[in-house]
Amino acid sequence: MKNLKLIRVINDYTQLKVQMETGIPQSMISKYEKGDLMPTAENLIILAKFYNTSLDFLMDLTDERTPYPPKSK
């Protein structure tokens, strides 16, 4: 999940900072970023809200960063 690490680095956050803000253990964040573990749906939503970005961006389905939740049409 390259975009998950990318957005963390862009925001100048450490994995520990993300852990403190989201409650997701640093060890899991590391595994998510390396692609060793897929986040649960619940954790994906927590991360999308924290970073204010779409699930598609976090899951590397798009390179276009849009806010979370997506705006209704």
Spans of model-derived segments:
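Short basic helix-loop element that most often maps to the first helix and adjoining turn
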Residues: 2-21, 46, 71-73
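Short coil turns linking two alpha-helices in DNA-binding domains
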Residues: 14, 25-28, 40, 54
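DNA major-groove recognition helix of helix-turn-helix/homeodomain DNA-binding modules
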Residues: 23, 42-57
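Short, charged recognition helix plus adjacent turn
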Residues: 59-73
